[in-house]
Amino acid sequence: MLNPSDFIEEAVEEIRSTVGNEKAIIALSGGVDSSVASVLAGRAIGDNLTAVFVDHGLLREGEAEYVRKTFSERLNFRYIDASEEFLKELEGVTDPEEKRKIIGRVFIEVFERVAEEIGARYLVQGTIAPDWIESEGQIKSHHNVALPHGLVLEIVEPIRELYKDEVREIGLELGLPREMIQRQPFPGPGLAVRIVGEITREKIEICRRANAIVEEEVVESGLHESLWQYFAVLTDTMVTGVKGDVRDFGYLVVIRMVESLDAMTASVPELPWDLIKRISKRITAEIPEVTHVALSVSDKPPSTIEFA
């Protein structure tokens, strides 16, 4: 059984002995995994750590502002807007596995540029057990696991043996705000794994707004306290609809809500029908490009939590 205090002491010592007096950067996303890893690394090497937040243009609504506000005064913090670079590389790509690999590669290219600039030798990552288990099992690549050959930086992964519930325990022991610890997981590739087919700026905005509506309604209902994840997926399916008395043709959006303890398995709970109806009405009313909303009822397995 995990003893948070013992784990923290051992992890800090391991990071310190590995990095020594060298400089390191950490890939900070604002999620609980990278946040916990950043605090552990900060305790171990202090000012020799630089936290790098990369905006790849695929973040959920308000995410960049949240991360900057939360971490800019806590750590040596660098914000990098690399959205143009990521979106250019993703042009015309439809295969979800290829999207994940491209995003992982571009992340590393950005981190290596920053590392060269500040003279860092190590890259600290918030990789956790489900990430590498799914990657090694060839279920899907994770951006922080499928790293390119020839990587210059040496990787440090202080929480790679932990599951999400254990990471949250460590976060609480470290004194991180409960609000941060309990945030629902958001995938490293961002909305790229919630957009089926080619990624375009129009699709990103549609998916971002649909996700925001789902999050707002779930939090308002209080159901967020029992759910692992809740989000919207923009499919590549176009469906006929009616706006007023006129035929319309727009996208199909899928709502997904699951319960889980560690992301290795997940189940779809009994959901309040009035909540689903509210979400559906808001999405079709507030996002004119969407004509239909569906609900995913598949557990993991056989499905994965994210669509792509």
Swiss-Prot record:
Binding-site positions, ATP:
29-35
Identify the pathway.
Answer: Purine metabolism; GMP biosynthesis; GMP from XMP (L-Gln route): step 1/1
Catalyses which reaction(s): XMP + L-glutamine + ATP + H2O = GMP + L-glutamate + AMP + diphosphate + 2 H(+)
Q: Which InterPro entries match?
A: GMP_synth_C, GMP_synthase_B, GMPS_ATP_PPase_dom, NAD/GMP_synthase, Rossmann-like_a/b/a_fold
Q: Which domain of life is it from?
A: Archaea
Which CDD domains would you find in this protein's record? Answer: GMP_synthase_C
Keywords for this entry?
ATP-binding, GMP biosynthesis, Ligase, Nucleotide-binding, Purine biosynthesis
A molecular function GO annotation: ATP binding
- The EC number(s) attached to this protein equal 6.3.5.2
Question: Where do the GMPS ATP-PPase domain residues begin and end?
Answer: 2-183
GO CC annotation terms, alphabetical? cytosol
What SUPFAM superfamilies does the record tag this protein with?
Adenine nucleotide alpha hydrolases-like
Function, please?
Catalyzes the synthesis of GMP from XMP.
**Entries under NCBIfam families matching the protein:** guaA_Cterm
Share what the entry says about its subunit structure, partners included.
Heterodimer composed of a glutamine amidotransferase subunit (A) and a GMP-binding subunit (B).
Q: Tell me the PANTHER family matching this sequence.
A: GMP SYNTHASE [GLUTAMINE-HYDROLYZING], GMP SYNTHASE-RELATED
Its protein name is GMP synthase [glutamine-hydrolyzing] subunit B
Q: Which organism is it from?
A: Methanothermobacter thermautotrophicus (strain ATCC 29096 / DSM 1053 / JCM 10044 / NBRC 100330 / Delta H)
Gene symbol here is guaAB
